[in-house]
Amino acid sequence: MRLEEYAEGIYVGYRYFDSFGIEPLFSFGYGLSYTEFDIRLCGINTASKGVTVTVEVENTGTTYSGKEVVQIYASLPQDGSRKEFRRLVGYEKTEELKPGEKEMLNIVLPAKAFASFLEEQQEWRIQAGAYGIWIGNSLSEAKLSAGVKVSADVMMEKTKKLEDHSEVVEIKDCAEELCRRAEEWTALLEELPNVSFEPEAEEKKVCRFSEETEIPVEDLIPLLYGNMSEIRSTLGASGIKVPGTAGETSEALFDQYGIPSLIMADGPAGIRLQQTYEVDREKDTVYGTGVLGSLENGYLVGRKDHEGAERYYQYCTAFPVGTALAQSWNKKTDGTVWTEGCGRDGRISY
C-alpha cells in the first residue's frame, strides 16, 4: 500500500486559498441568513492562558430573527519560515436575536492557538512579535480589529519525532509574499487597540505506570489490530459484542487486565448496528452475516433463521455525524445533541 504524501503541508483548506491569494467562490465560514448583523469589538484582554475578545452582535434587520457566528482569525509574525496568513483561533454563535436585539459575547482564544510548530526543534512555540486579530462572520469578511504583542518566545509544548517524512516534497511556500502582507497589516495596528500578552507553557500531564502495571507490547497489539491469528477478519462486519459494527479489537486482555474489546465506528456514519441478529446459546456466539448482511438491513442477502437460535432486535436513534454538527458552528449543539439525546433514549428504553 502506497504511503499517502501530504504535499500541502500546513496549507490545508482555507489556509491555502488565504495564503496564496486565491479567492474561492464561497469563503471559509460563509453562510446565508434572512437578516443582517453588525459585529463590534468592545474589548480585548489577556491572561497567561489566552486572550479574551469581547464583541457585541446586533441584529440590524427589520423583519426576521436569526443567529450570527462571530469568527476570530489571527495573523502570526512572519519571519520567513513556513506559516499561513491567517488561522481560525476562536468562534462563538449567538442566541436567536430579534430585529434590533443585541448580545455580548466573550470569546476565549487559548494560548496554544497562537503557537507555531518548529520542525527542527520539535516543539510548539509562541514566537515574539505582533499578532493581528481579525473579526467577522467569515474569513473573507473578517476585518483587522486589534493587535496582540508578545515580548519573548515561549515554548508551549515539547514533542518527540516518531517517524521521519523529510522525503516528502511539499509545495513551495509563499513566505516572501506573506512577509510583504505582514508589513501592511502590522502598520495598521498603530490605529487599533493593542494589548500585551505573556503566555505560559502548558502543564502537560504525564501518565506513569509502575513495572507491575505495564502491559507487554505483544499483549497490546490485539487492541489495535484484533486477533489476527483467528480466522475472523477485523474488517467488514466483524463486530461480536455489538453485531453489525465495522470492526472489533480483542477480548484477549479482558481476563488478565479487565480491558474489554474496542468497538469500531464505520467512519463518520456511526457504528452501523444490525437491527436484528441471532445468538447460538450452545456456543454462546452470534451468527455472523458478513459485510452484505450488515448493509441495508440485510436486504442484499435476505433473512436466514438458524434452528434453535434466539433472535434479538436493536433499534437506535440516528444522530447527526460530527462533520454536520461542526458545520453549525454551535458549540452548545455539539454537546447537547449527543448527551440529551442519549439521555432521552436511555429513559425510554428503561
In which residue ranges do the predicted regions lie?
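Short, surface-exposed ligand- or partner-binding patches at beta-edge/loop junctions that are enriched
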Residues: V108-L139
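Intrinsically disordered, low-complexity Pro/Gly/Ser/Thr-rich segments with frequent PxxP/GP/PP motifs
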Residues: D79-E119
